[in-house]
């Protein structure tokens, strides 16, 4: 972190409750460099990048989450072993989605936007000069569930379809929690932006 600070890739952001210095990404240009580097590491081949581009463009225009989730499962999350996955949380999932979806030409990307003292996870708001195109605004809320809580081992999980997983009680509960929060966030955003907003909301629960 010290070297990144001296090179200008991180900047001071005050202190935490313990008096320790906090560092943050200084601006959108540096944020884009981080995202592009992470994306190159996760998808090193040209064919992978082309596939990602096609999938995210489909998501931007339609809100189709299925192919995007498939891509993340087959690429980003494969780099984690079982020990890594034990410590994964909503931040890990959000980072994977942010890196995959990041496009500052089309969108104003906001991680954890403040919505009347509440925080959503990821907002993709179409840039004003791109509103004439077939782009939708997107708001995502992430939840995570452990294998222990759903009562499956890794082999059983791999053999279970996404549709079957959605019917498990803990998954139903988490999806409902996320959808309730998204409904409240939608009201706030629609009051702020009115008819210009074409908002799609997405509840994502990751095991």
Residue ranges with predicted function:
Residues 169-207:
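Nucleic-acid nuclease catalytic cores
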Residues 1-178:
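Extended alpha-helical interface modules used as scaffolds for assembling large macromolecular complexes
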């Amino acid at each position: 972190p010290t070297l990144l600070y001296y090179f200008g890739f991180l900047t001071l952001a005050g202190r935490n409750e313990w008096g320790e210095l906090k560092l943050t990404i200084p601006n959108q240009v540096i944020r884009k460099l981080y995202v592009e580097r992470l994306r190159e590491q996760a998808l090193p081949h040209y064919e992978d990048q082309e596939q990602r581009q096609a999938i995210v463009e489909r998501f931007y225009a339609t809100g189709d989450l299925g192919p995007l989730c498939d891509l993340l499962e087959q690429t980003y999350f494969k780099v984690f072993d079982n020990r890594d996955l034990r410590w994964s949380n909503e931040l890990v999932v959000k980072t994977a989605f942010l890196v995959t979806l990041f496009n500052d030409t089309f969108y104003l990307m906001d991680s954890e936007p403040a919505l009347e003292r509440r925080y959503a996870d990821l907002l993709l708001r179409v840039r004003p000069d791109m509103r004439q195109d077939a782009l939708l605004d997107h708001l995502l809320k992430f939840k995570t569930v452990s294998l222990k809580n759903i009562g499956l081992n890794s082999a059983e999980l791999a053999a279970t379809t996404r549709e079957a997983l959605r019917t498990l009680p803990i998954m139903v509960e988490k999806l409902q929690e996320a959808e309730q929060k998204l409904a409240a966030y939608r009201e706030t955003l629609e009051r702020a932006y009115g008819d210009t907003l074409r908002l799609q909301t997405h509840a994502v629960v990751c095991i």
